[in-house]
Amino acid sequence: MSIRIGILGYGNLGRGVECAIKHNPDLELVAVFTRRAPETVKILTETAAVYSVNDAEKMKDKIDVLIICGGSATDLPKQTPEYAKMFNVIDSFDTHARIPEHFDAVDAAAKESGHIGIISVGWDPGMFSLNRLYANAILTNGKDYTFWGKGVSQGHSDAVRRIDRKSVV
């Protein structure tokens, strides 16, 4: 029996998640949910369908895990707690300073509905944080550095998407 996966958001991250699912035979992509017109979204998985985000609740008994692939600035703070009420969820929330409040919101929604919410899974925090942990375990007297802070390395993609192209030209 495979784990049935849904993807919410089909930008670069959503497409990457779909490709990763294809490499894992114990995972099955069931649905992709989008805010765009579903018929305009072309996915690689022939056995999965594309739906409007408005139809996600109808699929709550057909999906084991919903991977939420939105932006940390505005999407994930709203979407992850909302969908944790219906699904087990995973997101890649990466605004370090707001992780505690995001955790609290997702945790409360997931506990209330009997679901599991896993947040901040990605590069940093995530794989980059694990690499730092491994290095600290080996180099016990070493000093590690991190390069995030106010206005640094937080939401670059989200900020770039909000640039008005007309004002740049």
List PLM regions with ranges:
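Active-site-lining helix/loop region of Rossmann-like oxidoreductase modules
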Residues: 2-8, 12, 16, 134-169
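NAD(P)-binding Rossmann-fold cofactor-contacting core
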Residues: 23-45
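Short, hydrophobic beta-strand segments that form beta-sheet elements in well-ordered domains
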Residues: 30-35, 50, 66-69
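Short acidic-hydrophobic, aromatic-tinged amphipathic segments that line or gate anion-handling sites
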Residues: 49-55
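Rossmann-fold NAD(P) dinucleotide-binding segment
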Residues: 56-61, 65, 73-92
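General beta-strand structural signal in soluble alpha/beta enzymes
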Residues: 89-92, 117-121, 147
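Rossmann-fold NAD(P)-binding glycine/threonine-rich loop
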Residues: 93-117
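Short alpha-helices
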Residues: 115-136
